[in-house]
């Protein structure tokens, strides 16, 4: 988990050194199109407000990453929707769902192509505290069951209990008008 001050909107982590692990030497020489393809295959995203396409059913939204990567669809949408408690919503458009149901559909979409990493940006910001707790616990449980590295950026300190490891941004500097750069942070493993 990345815990950021409440005054910070977007921010950027800039590498200070080292090399990424397990991505191969070609990664360092990749152009932006190759990097985009790599991200599409290896990273699932959960956006703050879900980011579902409003003209696609929940089923089609969940299947979208698999369709784009030309992976077989199978029963992935049904399985993930069932695990997230939204199976009855599969044939509805996002506008017909509650905020919490839309966020669970977004989580299913992020997991649908079985990426090794899922990045969730404020996944519970628009949800009431009770449902935020449920969704966070569910996301953490699914990430553990599916062996996915889950990175959550949030202002919500109460979500830290679900994290195995937390980066706490103490000092944030403006890099430009639209983003922030973390200049100092501490890494804290969570107590068992």
Task: Give residue spans per PLM region.
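Helix N-cap at the start of a conserved alpha-helix in ABC-type nucleotide-binding domains
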Residues: 129-131
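ABC ATPase NBD coupling module
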Residues: 18-44
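Conserved ABC ATPase signature
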Residues: 93-97, 101-103
């Amino acid at each position: 988990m990345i815990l950021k001050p409440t005054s910070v909107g977007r921010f950027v982590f800039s590498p200070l050194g080292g090399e990424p692990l397990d991505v191969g030497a070609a990664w360092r020489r990749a152009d932006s199109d190759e990097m985009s393809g790599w991200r599409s295959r290896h990273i699932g995203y959960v956006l703050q407000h879900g980011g579902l396409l409003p003209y696609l059913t929940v089923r089609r939204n969940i299947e979208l990453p698999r369709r784009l990567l030309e992976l077989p669809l199978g029963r992935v949408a049904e399985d993930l929707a069932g695990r997230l408690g939204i199976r009855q919503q599969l044939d509805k458009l996002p506008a017909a769902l509650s905020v919490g149901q839309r966020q669970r559909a977004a989580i299913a979409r992020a997991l649908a192509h079985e990426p090794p990493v899922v990045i969730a940006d404020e996944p519970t910001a628009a949800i009431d505290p009770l449902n935020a707790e449920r969704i966070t616990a569910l996301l953490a449980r699914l990430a553990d069951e599916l062996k996915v590295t889950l990175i959550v950026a949030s202002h919500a300190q109460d979500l830290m209990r679900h994290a195995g490891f937390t980066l706490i941004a103490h000092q944030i500097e403006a890099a430009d008008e639209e983003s922030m750069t973390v200049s100092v942070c501490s890494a804290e493993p969570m107590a068992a």
